[in-house]
Structures are given as structure tokens and as C-alpha cells.
């Protein structure tokens, strides 16, 4: 299994247990699901009994995003201006990391990041934002949106801002 770990904060953000796809050679996207959680147990709602009336939630049960829940991501918020300011600083931190670890990837990162960043900004109101468990303000902000079907959530993380740790 591969765990995607933020190179700035050290937070675990995603794993290949989810269907991870590389987009524009700069962002990993993974579809998520909304699941029911009861006292730490996860119920994905599969195979409900024919006698049950539906998926009524039991007391103490809540519906959560499985990636957000599994990696203990913390929701945060931005207006467009503060997000752009954050991203400018974050991109500098990732570029400094790449200069030290993988200088030949800097150009691909800069070009791909600009393209994906424009996509996010153009649909800014559709995105939710999460930090890693440590809530490090310098760390990566995980992006969450919905596919074209309007019901399938997905997360996006910056490829060059994570290390891929095999466990």
C-alpha cells in the first residue's frame, strides 16, 4: 500500500486503497464516498435488508466522507483572495522542496500547477478545503469537489507536495 504524505507537514493525506488517478501530471484525484460511522465503525451501506425501510441513521451515527474521516482531515475555509495568497506561498514551499529533492520536476510542477489552479479558481465556489490532521498552516490543503454527476465526491492533492511511502 502507498500512503501519500504531505512533504511540508508530514500528515498522511491519501492512500492507494482509493482509486487514485494522476491528472495533468500534477494532481492526484481519488473518488470518495459518503459512509455511515457509528462509534468508530464504518458502514458503507451495502446490501441493506429488504425488510428495512431505508438507510435510517441510528442514534450516534453520522454520515461522513470516507477519505476525510480515514485521514482525519480538518475542514478549513477560504475566500478566493485568501486561497490565492495561500497557494502562492504553498507553491513556493513546494518549489523549494523540489529544488532540494527533485530539481528536474520544477518546470512540470509549475506548468501543471498553473493549469489546475486556474480550474479550481474558475469554479471556486464548488470546492471544499481540508488540512491534514496537524492543521499545519504551511501544509497542503486537500481539495474536495464533486464529479459531473453531482453525487460522487473526489479529493485532489498536489503530486509534487507529497511523498509516496510504501508500507
UniProtKB/Swiss-Prot annotation:
Under the heading Gene3D superfamilies, the entry gives: Metal Binding Protein, Guanine Nucleotide Exchange Factor, Chain A
What are the protein's UniProt keywords? Cytoplasm, Cytoskeleton, Microtubule, Protein biosynthesis
| GO cellular component terms, semicolon-separated | cytosol; microtubule; mitochondrion
InterPro entries from the entry?
Answer: Mss4-like_sf, Mss4/transl-control_tumour, TCTP, Translation_control_tumour_CS, Translational_control_tumour_p
The subcellular localization recorded is: Cytoplasm, Cytoskeleton
Question: One GO molecular function term?
Answer: calcium ion binding
* PROSITE patterns assigned: TCTP_1, TCTP_2, TCTP_3
Which GO BP terms apply? cytoplasmic translation; negative regulation of autophagy; negative regulation of microtubule depolymerization
Q: Which domain of life is it from?
A: Eukaryota
TCTP domain location is 1-167
Protein's job: Involved in protein synthesis. Involved in microtubule stabilization.
Q: Which family does it belong to?
A: Belongs to the TCTP family.
The protein in question is named Translationally-controlled tumor protein homolog
Amino acid at each position: 500500500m502507498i500512503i501519500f504524505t504531505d512533504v511540508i507537514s508530514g500528515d498522511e493525506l491519501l492512500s492507494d486503497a482509493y482509486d487514485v488517478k494522476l491528472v495533468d501530471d500534477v494532481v492526484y484525484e481519488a473518488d470518495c464516498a459518503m459512509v455511515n460511522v457509528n462509534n468508530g465503525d464504518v458502514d458503507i451501506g451495502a446490501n441493506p435488508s429488504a425488510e428495512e425501510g431505508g438507510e435510517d441513521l441510528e442514534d450516534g451515527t453520522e454520515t461522513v466522507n470516507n477519505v476525510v474521516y480515514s485521514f482525519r482531515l480538518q475542514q478549513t475555509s477560504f475566500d478566493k483572495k485568501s486561497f490565492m495568497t495561500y497557494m502562492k506561498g504553498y507553491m513556493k514551499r513546494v518549489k523549494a522542496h523540489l529544488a532540494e529533492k527533485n530539481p528536474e520536476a520544477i518546470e512540470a510542477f509549475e506548468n501543471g500547477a498553473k493549469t489546475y489552479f486556474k480550474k479550481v479558481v474558475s469554479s471556486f465556489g464548488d470546492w471544499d478545503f481540508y488540512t491534514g490532521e496537524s492543521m499545519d498552516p504551511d501544509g497542503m490543503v486537500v481539495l474536495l469537489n464533486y464529479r459531473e454527476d453531482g453525487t460522487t465526491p473526489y479529493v485532489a492533492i498536489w503530486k509534487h507536495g507529497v511523498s509516496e511511502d510504501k508500507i
